[in-house]
Curated annotation (Swiss-Prot):
GO terms for biological process: regulation of carbohydrate metabolic process. Belongs to the HPrK/P family. Homohexamer. Residues 201-210 are annotated as: Important for the catalytic mechanism of both phosphorylation and dephosphorylation. The active site is at residues 138, 159, 177, 243. Keywords: ATP-binding, Carbohydrate metabolism, Kinase, Magnesium, Metal-binding, Multifunctional enzyme, Nucleotide-binding, Serine/threonine-protein kinase, Transferase. Pfam families: Hpr_kinase_C, Hpr_kinase_N. Its EC number is 2.7.11.-, 2.7.4.-. Residues 264-269 are annotated as: Important for the catalytic mechanism of dephosphorylation. CDD domains: HprK_C. It catalyses: [HPr protein]-L-serine + ATP = [HPr protein]-O-phospho-L-serine + ADP + H(+); [HPr protein]-O-phospho-L-serine + phosphate + H(+) = [HPr protein]-L-serine + diphosphate. This is HPr kinase/phosphorylase. The keyword Magnesium applies.
């Protein structure tokens, strides 16, 4: 899980730092945003201090009606040593009591000109993306006809060579060798390349090549949602492979199941074309067109008709 601080928000959303510079590098550990409306009324029993606090027009309008003593009390309770930051939206004027309390405990106070609702949505999306669970998988990720295909298999089976052929056919490389995967939602996995090897492809006997330099910017993309896994394995004569496409297998990554196809590798098989067709067939299945199921249904109908004749 990546580390996110108020300083990252400062740079990302071009915020204005007003006070509490001492705590600008405090870690933000949750993507939940708190709008402390009930806290402005004095109820701090269940105050989520570890969340980012967002103050808008509603909270500050109520705050202005408080007595000077209550104002100081509310802001001193709002600013704790666990609070990662407080953001003021709409470019509103910041209460001096907040500036004083934030400096005392080192809580960064930031200000933005963006409306409260929109800012809350932007912050939540950014934090969910950055704080999402992360893992790394050995394989190649390619965007094929808009489908994120994760190509896996043992070392030397031909993953990178297949990816190179796919790039030559007009598809886009996301990552080679190591794929960093984030679970950004309950059922969404997004893969990207580590920065060190971004746009690079390693071909045995040839070495490392830069795909973007060779094929242009259209041959790469920074990230892609993973929708399908294609596992390459050396052909095993003793193993029975699926010939109809009715059986479904899945690869589980961080409790998310990804449809998985196993493609046996042997001389003479054009893996790039096979994976290309697999991606197109996957799209058809999502549209409700399943050729294997249609064939099975027709076959069953023929068998039933034959039984009725006898």
């Amino acid at each position: 899980m990546a580390k996110v601080t108020a300083n990252d928000l400062l740079e990302r959303f071009q915020l204005e730092l007003l006070s509490g510079e001492e705590g600008i590098h405090r870690s933000i550990t949750t993507s939940d945003i708190s709008r402390p409306g009930i806290e402005m009324a004095g109820f701090f029993t269940y105050y989520p201090a570890k969340r980012l606090q967002l103050l808008g027009r509603t909270e500050l309008s109520f705050y202005k009606q408080l007595s000077p003593v209550d104002k100081e009390e509310r802001m001193s309770k709002l600013c704790t040593y666990d609070t990662p930051g407080i953001i003021i939206s709409r470019g509103l004027e910041v209460p001096p009591e907040l500036l004083k309390a934030s400096e005392k405990v080192g809580v960064p106070v930031l200000r933005s000109n963006i409306t409260t609702t929109r800012l809350s949505s932007m912050l939540t999306n950014f934090l969910e993306s950055q704080l999402a669970p992360t893992t790394a998988v050995h394989g190649v990720l390619v965007d094929i006809y808009g489908i994120g295909v994760l190509i896996t298999g043992s070392s030397g089976v031909g993953k990178s060579e297949t990816a190179l052929d796919l790039v030559r056919r007009g598809h886009r490389l996301v990552a080679d060798d190591s794929v960093e995967i984030r679970r950004e939602h309950e059922d969404t996995l997004v893969g990207r390349s580590p920065e060190l090897i971004q746009h690079l492809l390693e071909i045995r006997g040839l070495g490392i090549i830069n795909v973007m330099t060779l094929f242009g910017a259209g041959a790469v993309r920074p990230f892609k949602r993973i929708a399908l896994c294609v596992n390459l394995e050396l052909w095993d004569q003793k193993k029975v492979y699926d010939r109809l496409g009715l059986s479904e297998d899945y690869l589980r990554i961080m409790n998310v199941d990804i449809p998985k196809l196993t493609i046996p590798v042997r001389p003479g098989r054009n893996l790039a074309v096979i994976i290309e067709v697999a991606a197109m067939n996957f799209r058809l299945k999502r549209l409700g067109i399943n050729a294997a199921q249609q064939f099975s249904d027709r076959l069953n109908d023929v068998i039933e008709e034959g039984e009725q004749e006898f």
